[in-house]
Amino acid sequence: MQTQKTLRPYPGALLNPKVDPIFKSLFTQNTEESKAALTAFLSAILRQPIIDVTIGQNELPVEADDDKKTIFDITCKNETEDKFLNIEMQGQNDSDSFDNRSEYHVAHLLNHFVKKGMDWDEVPEAFMISVLNFVYDRTVDDGFLEYTMRLEDGKRLKSTRMKIIYLELPKYENIPDMPVEKLTTVQKWAKFFLYANRKEKSEYLKILSESEAGIMEAYKSLDSISQSEAEWIRETAYWDAISNKKTTIGTAERRGKRQGLKEGIKKGIEQGQRLKAI
C-alpha cells in the first residue's frame, strides 16, 4: 500500500504556534479545549480571572494567510465587566512603527464598541495583546510589556481604558529550563509557544502542560489541529511567503547598491574630467 504524502515531518509532530495563522487557529477552534486554552491564556496575560470569552463571528474561522487577517476580536468577562480585545501573534517586525500600529488597533477597537450616547463612566476597557516572536524593546530585560496612558511624569495614570500588552518570546529563551514550579504562569505560556514544535523539547513541554491546566488544553488543541494536512499546508505557505519576501527585499537592496555604485563612478569620472579642464 502506498503511503500518503504529508507535510507533517513525523508522527506526533506539532505545528508551530509562533506562525501567525497557526496561533490564531489554535485559539479559535469550536472546541472545548480551544476555548479553555484561550480563557486561561487571557487570565494569565490580564492577571485576573476571566470567566468567559466570545470570539467575533466575522473572524471565525481562519481562512487566509494574509498577515493582516491574523488578528482576532474577543469579548471577555471577568466577575464585574466586559472587556474587548484584539489578540495576535506577530512573527516579524516589518517596520519601525509597530507601536503606532498597536495604538491604531486598540483605538479602533474601542471606537467600534463604544456606542453613541454612552455614559463615559461605562466605557469598557480595550486591549491590544501582541505575542511577538521578535524583541520590540531592547532597553528592558522583561519580556512582558504593558502600556497605558500616563502623564508625562510617567508616574500618574491618565487612563486605563486602552492598554497595549506585548509578550516578547525571544527574551524567554534566556530563562533556563528550571523545575516548572519555579516559573510564573506567563513564563510557562511563553515557553509553550517557544517549545511546542521543537522535538528536542517534547519532554519538557509535557511537564509544562501537566503543571498548568490551561496549557494542557492548549496542547490538546494544538495536537488536534496538527492532525490536519490543511494546517501544515498553511504553515508551509507562511514560511514560503516569508522567504519570497526576504528574497525580494534582498534583490532590491543589491540592485540599489549596484545602481548607486554606477552613479558614484559616473560622478567620479565627471569630477575628474572637470579637474583636468581647469
Regions found by a protein language model. Give the residues of each.
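Elongated, amphipathic alpha-helical interaction scaffolds
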Residues: 1-278
